[in-house]
């Protein structure tokens, strides 16, 4: 199907995407490049329904096997979050198609116009706390049912375990391996081994020993300035999610980086006012 467009010349909507249009007889009347992606194409689609009214969707298209893992993982992440709280665009579907002998994958979601980025501190904290407190792991364990991706890195979280230390160690080990592939630096190798063998167990094992426990919470997975915003209706929004069931404080990790607006103490203070710090608090800085 050739899109009747104003902006993207000769844009073709693959037949595999057509099945997700809301009502039979709907047609795409406009396709506009929207936002920025370092790895694929992002498009706003305007759909005309048989009634004559219009609806907007956001389409992300990526190449190759990594593109498939990314689109599927983000769709499953959005679906999981949306079932708990409607602070994400509604997930519509994902799939695959081939064009000019290139394999593509796509993610189709509700289009939501955004305003301020990041969202206001109290609003974002309330939104994130709602997700963490209301979500329930389907197995009662940490992990996720499919791989999810942080940028172009496939996260090693697609298994289930009772131990947060085990899951985080798997996750961090994969990240360290990705980093090692980019440069040769023996000191980095040694530091990575020490962090995994000494630091991670020292910080995380006490969360689940001596009678203490933590709940596996559904997390955003990449909660930084660029992946949260205020919508047109004033509500905070999440997007570009890379979810799994984790310790809730995982989502606050990005907030420690001074380059992020979320490093402002107002964000952490607002969250801690709603969700207390996990014990033993004395082991944290």
Model-derived regions: residue spans:
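Juxta-kinase regulatory segment immediately upstream of eukaryotic protein kinase catalytic domains
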Residues: 1-31
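Short, surface-exposed alpha-helical segments at coil->helix boundaries
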Residues: 10-14, 75, 265-268
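An alpha-helical support segment within catalytic cores of ATP-dependent transferases
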Residues: 12-22, 97-100, 136-220, 231-233
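Short acidic/polar mixed-charge low-complexity motifs
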Residues: 25, 51-55, 235
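ATP-binding pocket architecture of kinase catalytic cores
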Residues: 33-166, 170, 178
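Membrane-helix interface segments
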Residues: 87, 117-120, 263-264, 281-285
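Active-site Asp-x-Gly
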Residues: 164-169, 173, 177, 213-218, ...
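Helical subdomain adjoining the active site within ATP-dependent kinase catalytic cores
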Residues: 185, 189, 277-284
């Amino acid at each position: 199907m050739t899109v009747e467009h104003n902006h993207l010349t000769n844009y073709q909507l693959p037949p595999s995407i057509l099945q997700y249009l809301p009502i039979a007889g709907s047609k795409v009347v406009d396709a506009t490049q929207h936002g920025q992606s370092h790895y694929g194409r992002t498009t706003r689609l305007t759909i005309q329904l048989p009634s004559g009214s219009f609806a907007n969707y956001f389409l992300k298209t990526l190449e190759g096997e990594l593109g498939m893992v990314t689109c599927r993982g983000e769709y499953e992440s959005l679906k999981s979050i949306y079932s708990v709280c409607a602070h994400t665009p509604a997930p519509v579907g994902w799939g695959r198609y081939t064009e000019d002998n290139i394999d593509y994958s796509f993610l189709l979601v509700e289009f939501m116009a955004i305003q301020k980025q990041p969202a206001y501190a109290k609003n974002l904290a309330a939104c994130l706390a709602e997700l963490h407190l209301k979500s329930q792991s389907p197995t009662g364990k940490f992990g996720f049912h499919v791989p999810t991706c942080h940028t172009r890195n496939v996260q090693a979280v697609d298994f289930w375990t009772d131990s947060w230390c085990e899951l985080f160690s798997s996750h961090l080990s994969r990240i360290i391996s990705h980093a090692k592939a980019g440069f040769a630096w023996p000191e980095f190798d040694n530091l990575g081994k020490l962090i995994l063998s000494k630091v991670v167990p020292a910080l995380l094992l006490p969360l689940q020993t001596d009678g203490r426990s933590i709940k596996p919470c559904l997390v955003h997975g990449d909660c930084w300035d660029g992946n949260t915003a205020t919508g047109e209706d004033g509500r905070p929004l999440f997007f570009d999610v890379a979810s799994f069931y984790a310790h809730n404080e995982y989502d606050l990790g990005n907030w420690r980086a001074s380059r992020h607006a979320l490093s402002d103490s107002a964000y952490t203070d607002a969250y801690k006012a709603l969700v207390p710090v996990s014990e033993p608090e004395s082991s944290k800085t």
